[in-house]
Amino acid sequence: MCHLLLSTLLIVLWAQTLPINGCIDGERRALISFKGRIIDPANRLSSWEGRNCCKWQGVECHNITGRVVKLNLRNTNDDDSALNGEISPSLLQLRDLMYLDLSSNDFATSVPSFLGSLKNLQYLNLSRTYIFGTIPQHLGNLSNLKYLDLGNMKSEAIYADNLNWLMHLKSLKYLDMSFVDLMDVSNWLAAVNKLPSLEQLLLGVSGITIRSNSLPHINFTSLKVLDLNSGIALNTLPLWLWNLTDLAHLDLSYCSFKGLIPHELGNLRSLNTVLLRDNDFKGIFPKALNPLCNLTNLDLSYIGFSGEVAMWTKELPSCNRNILNVLKLSGNNLNGSLFGWLEKMTELVSVDVSYNSLTGVVPIGVWKLPMLTKLDLSNNLFEGVISEVELSYMKKLKELGLSANNLTVRVPKDWTPTFNLLVIKLGSCRLRREFPSWIKSFTELTYLDLSNNAISDKLPSWFWNTFHNLQNLDLSNNQIQGRLPVLLQFMALSNLNLSFNQFEGPLAPLPESLTSLDLANNFFSGSLQIPNPLLNIYTLRLSNNNIVGTIPISICKSPYLSLLDLSNNNISGEVPACLGRSQALQILDLGSNNLLGHIPDSLCSTGMPLVIRTSNNHFDGPFPSFLKQCTTLMILDLRQNKFLGILPDWIGESLTNITILNLRNNMFSGSILTQLGQLQYLQVLDLSHNNLSGSIPLLANFSKLSSKELEFNDDFLSYEMSGYYMYYMVLVTKSEELQFSKTSLLVESIDLSANNFMGEIPEFFGKLFKLQNLNLSENHFTGKIPSNLGNMKSLESLDLSMNDLFGEIPQTLSKLTSLSYLNMSYNNFSGKIPTGDQLQTLNDPTIYIGNPYLCGPPLPIACFSNSTHSYHSDNENEGGLLSVEWLWMYIGLLLGFVIGFWVVCGSLLLNRSWRYAYFNMTDNLFGRFNVTIALLLAKLCRKK
């Protein structure tokens, strides 16, 4: 009886502790405190009022205890709804909290270490926020944690020193640390191997090193999803991978693995997704895929395979050809046609075979694939005509890519499609000159490429207010006319390319959502004042227009601006100093304007520019000292300005990544310092048309010009290959001023012409095997041509004209098999012109004009056998030695004079009668001359 009373009393006391309003008062206050430190721009937490916190949005409580067990504040809307502020430690009052999701918000703080004290936490998601700093070791205290997502942070400054804390999370099933910097973590694999319950591991773009070593024992064999994309691979695929027999999803994209795809891959029979994009595999299509009967998603893009595409597809699993949903083979060197294999894969949803060498017409069976939503055939060699007949079969199609083939798309103006495309890529598809009105039906369009189609129409009025969801628009390389409408600013565009058209008028208000804008090569005029700020812009190209005025300060308000190209306009004034403080700026091109003053000296203090081009302006002053900080600089083009003074010695010590250095047409003076030879990546050096003097020092460290292989800066190549920027390099080669664009990084040139250099031509030039152009003309070089110049196998143009060179032209120059231009004019060369091989084709006599002691073809002067013409400058041998022919000529003249003199004068001296007769005759002639003059004067006087 006593026990019954005691039990009843305990139940009553326990019932009194339960929350009357369904919420623990202390936890309600903790949530209010948490809200107090949060900025809520969209008022998402407006429901956080009243006594019962269990009814607040994002809050869930235990049905019995009333304690908060779940807090889900994930932002599922746009960025304008993101919470920001601080994550308050008041969350520690939620002692039973098992689920915490703060993802996709804008919390700008480090990972709170106090989260490691929430012992009951099973789910923690902080992904897609601005959280930064080191991941705290305290997270290792969450022994009940099953789900941890720290991936895809909006900031790029979250990292881990080690992952030892991870070993304590024995219950963990899901781990996402994508985009977390793990480059310094060497024990990541050992830590993961301590997690026996792990089913999903995502470490993409984390900088981890993937070694090919094996593990003594594999503990994480329950793994079903493995994402290591963009890891650093040291060799081939790791051996421990083949023990993960439950693996269903494997992503090893962008890892640079080499060699063959191992046959052990076929042991992973549970695989349904294999993503091996962007690796360096070789050989034929892997037979290892044949046993994978569950395979539905296969991506083998950009892996270096080649051969007949039909032979490849024979190696696909025969047991699953009718269940494969996604097939991506783009970016290889596949050839052949689509006949006989593609139309048989009836379950295909997405096909991408772009950027190959596939040929033939597109089979009608491909257009009839019933499930197809994406078809990308771009950048191949397909041919034929695509009409509305073929397109009408594709009822479910959402993405269509036909760009850059030999295809012709012919669709009637009044055709109404039976499907609704989201992506259209019809670049270079020979569309009609009229703008295609049939695309008006695709109101949900997000991507439109109609570039390079010779469209010469105006954009219809419906265009700008139809595609409200359009994010990418490329109409470049057409002949489209008109002005930009005001409606443009209301579109959702992210990338806009209208370059190489005939648009005109002032710049209109632009969408604030723009990240890339290309209006180059049009007829836009007016000032550069863009009516609204472009806060999200990354690349901005307005080159080759008629823009005037100054560069506005408002352009400095674009914090992400990495590429600014305003070249070839009529912009004047000074460059705003604030532009130099743009931290993201990598490419600055202000060439061919009317700018003056100085380049902002803060340009390299915060950013890491790759290209600075200010050529053909009116900048002045000494060589910019701020460039000493530009250690990442790859291209420096200061050509045709008013810079003066000496070149500093730190150029070779600080600009260690420079590839193109163009200082042509300035007023630099002094000599070239030896430190310039430290520029080991230099490919183009142009110091021509300055006042430089002295001799050429040893520059033998130009290893790029002497190496057998070329290496390029990946960051710069990404701009060129994407089409965002094209550096136009102007060089004088083969006596012509030429412009190089896409091939600018393939040119190797040294131009020191039109200076005051003296001394001998250094022999190190002969070691620059990759050099294509060498111009030393219009200087004061002396001595002989080094014979080792014949080793410059890549040399195409050699100009040594207008110097003081002498001696014989070396026979070794005949070994220059690539030489197509040669100028030796106006020197003091002597002897026979060498013949043979490539020199035989250079038969223009003007090549050697101004060298009077040269003989032999192509000159009309024949060489005497066994005779050698030589000339030595006064510097080498004062007085000189005359040739035999000239010596005899002078002797003959002297003898003739002596003989003639004594024949006349000697006779008069020796014979008296001859002498008297001679002088008598001269006296008579003189007398008659005087009488004649006197008579003429008398007649003139009488006439007056």
Kindly give the residue locations of the regions a language model identified.
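Plant-biased, solvent-exposed loop and capping regions
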Residues: 1-944
